[in-house]
Amino acid sequence: MGARYVAIAGNIGAGKSTLVGFLSKRFGLRPLYEPVDDNPYLNDFYKDMHAHAFASQIFYLTRKFALHIEAEGASDKVVLDRTIYEDAEIFVEALKARRVLNRRDYRTYRELYEVIRSQVRAPDLLVYLHCSVRGLKRRIQWRGRASEQAIPTGYLRSLSN
């Protein structure tokens, strides 16, 4: 077993990356950030969720698996920005409930997720950041990521429920 690791969870714009940065500086933890800017499907996903949900979520599942493996094998203490569990248990479930992800893609994703989940160790501590949807919208606008500006309020709300 590697060193202990902490994970930060929360909705889009809740302040996860900010807290990860603070914890890493304050306590000397190595930060592992969510690969938001690396996702080649993200801009397309926010333009047409139905067409790009599956590919975008598979991208995140793959990258988060790699981050979990890195965190588990680290000899130093690590703080992880978003977990593999949130992607599957919150994002994919919200996409299914909103009928953005069809049954076939949902089942395929869940099957892959369950295999991966059996191979990773849960974080030693999980911190959840809560923020109102109004606050999330303000922070997203302030942050200024072009791909996030058109996130539907209903989608953010479904991720918070």
Predicted regions and their residues:
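P-loop (Walker A) phosphate-binding loop of NTP-binding proteins
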Residues: N11
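Hydrophobic anchor at the beta1->P-loop junction of P-loop NTPases
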Residues: I8
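A glycine- and Lys/Arg-enriched "phosphate-lid" helix/loop adjacent to the NTP-binding pocket
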Residues: E89-N161
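Conserved substrate/cofactor phosphate-moiety recognition/catalytic segment
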Residues: K25-K64
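A basic- and aromatic-enriched beta-loop-alpha substructure that forms the phosphate/nucleotide-
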Residues: K64-R104
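Conserved lysine of the Walker
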Residues: K16
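Pre-Walker A (Motif I) flank of P-loop NTPase domains
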Residues: G2-Y5, D76
